[in-house]
Amino acid sequence: MKAATQARIDDSPLAWLDAVQRQRHEAGLRRCLRPRPAVATELDLASNDYLGLSRHPAVIDGGVQALRIWGAGATGSRLVTGDTKLHQQFEAELAEFVGAAAGLLFSSGYTANLGAVVGLSGPGSLLVSDARSHASLVDACRLSRARVVVTPHRDVDAVDAALRSRDEQRAVVVTDSVFSADGSLAPVRELLEVCRRHGALLLVDEAHGLGVRGGGRGLLYELGLAGAPDVVMTTTLSKALGSQGGVVLGPTPVRAHLIDAARPFIFDTGLAPAAVGAARAALRVLQAEPWRPQAVLNHAGELARMCGVAAVPDSAMVSVILGEPESAVAAAAACLDAGVKVGCFRPPTVPAGTSRLRLTARASLNAGELELARRVLTDVLAVARR
């Protein structure tokens, strides 16, 4: 046996992790977990609880009631024992709210994207994905065994070229409606025009659109595209609805097909009833209190002005680009020390040289919280931008 081979055998099979961790630390890309307290001790401008519903009494009560009626867990795949009347009622109610014909719940937004993209593509088909699509869409494309073309960010002409030159009979264009790193909107109307020109399906991830755009119904609804026969919507229950889970919404045949073909649906345990009950209650609060989506956008605009961001936000998110990872990490830490928790995005989540703070607005922010945010952000960014 060669000496180099013997040395590799003698080493721990995980020895390589030490070098990887050193490289991450040197690049300012090391991550760690920070448990949040049960009672917040700082102002939250980092979570995705856009409508402020995760602690709403009605939402908590909805989860508790479902827990008492249906038990703690789904107990199995929805095809075995994990389906309940509650699941199907909420699917129908959410579909009606966003203007879709039908919906199918998954255990997370991530698995909803995996199930939808892989289930609607496969060998012999083409997937066209935006360069800044969410990681769940990226992974879904990789798992699909379809040919994948990644187009430049928000480049409709590149999507058109990919579809025009294809040999595959089936094609699916996938995009976020609201891109998570900077809160920008996808050119959804233009993408659908291109898809229709070439006979392709459009799949739109509304994770950051639901509850904020279109009066809470999402960007597709706002653009008058909800319920289109050649559009599929995915979204999560973990952001605006303050719960957990994911859903695919679209034509009724899509739901029927995914029940038979989506592996994350077939083989995963069904979504816990408490999560469904909480999300259902949150949807009812949103319907009863339609002021919440506009409040999110209004507060996002205030946060942008505090940070000197000229563009009016199109979503709950405000992106403050600082450049290198170390600058963003230091600024986020300084904000936290001063009582304001903000998001910190670094590569590979965002391109190199664009590490940033990401602030997320909530409908429930009050005047005192906004004033605290103004003081802290003004001081921290003055130092970070020197």
Swiss-Prot record:
How is the enzymatic or functional activity of this protein modulated?
Answer: Inhibited by D-alanine and D-7-keto-8-amino-pelargonic acid.
Report the record's Gene Ontology biological process terms. Answer: biotin biosynthetic process
| Consequences of knocking out this gene | Cells lacking this gene are shown to be highly attenuated in a mouse tuberculosis model. Essential for growth even in liquid culture; growth does not occur on biotin-containing medium after biotin deprivation.
Q: Which UniProt keywords apply?
A: Acyltransferase, Biotin biosynthesis, Pyridoxal phosphate, Transferase
Q: Cross-referenced InterPro entries, in alphabetical order?
A: Aminotrans_II_pyridoxalP_BS, Aminotransferase_I/II_large, AON_synthase_class-II, PyrdxlP-dep_Trfase, PyrdxlP-dep_Trfase_major, PyrdxlP-dep_Trfase_small
> Short name of one Pfam family for this protein?
Aminotran_1_2
What enzyme category does the UniProt record give? transferase
- Assembly with partners or alone: Homodimer.
Q: Which cofactor does it need?
A: pyridoxal 5'-phosphate
Instruction: State the protein's name.
Output: 8-amino-7-oxononanoate synthase 1
Gene Ontology CC: peptidoglycan-based cell wall; plasma membrane
According to the UniProt record, list the residues that bear N6-(pyridoxal phosphate)lysine: 239
PANTHER family noted in UniProt: 8-AMINO-7-OXONONANOATE SYNTHASE, CLASS II AMINOTRANSFERASE/8-AMINO-7-OXONONANOATE SYNTHASE
Please state the Enzyme Commission number of this protein: 2.3.1.47
Q: What does this protein do?
A: Catalyzes the decarboxylative condensation of pimeloyl-[acyl-carrier protein] and L-alanine to produce 8-amino-7-oxononanoate (AON), [acyl-carrier protein], and carbon dioxide. Can also use pimeloyl-CoA instead of pimeloyl-ACP as substrate. To a lesser extent, can also utilize D-alanine instead of L-alanine as substrate.
Q: Where does substrate bind?
A: 31, 134, 349
> What is its pathway?
Cofactor biosynthesis; biotin biosynthesis
- Family statement drawn from the similarity comment of this UniProt entry: Belongs to the class-II pyridoxal-phosphate-dependent aminotransferase family. BioF subfamily.
Q: Where, if anywhere, are coiled coils annotated?
A: none
Q: Which domain of life is it from?
A: Bacteria
List the catalysed reactions: 6-carboxyhexanoyl-[ACP] + L-alanine + H(+) = (8S)-8-amino-7-oxononanoate + holo-[ACP] + CO2
Q: Extract the signal peptide range.
A: none
Residues holding pyridoxal 5'-phosphate: 109-110, 180, 205-208, 236-239
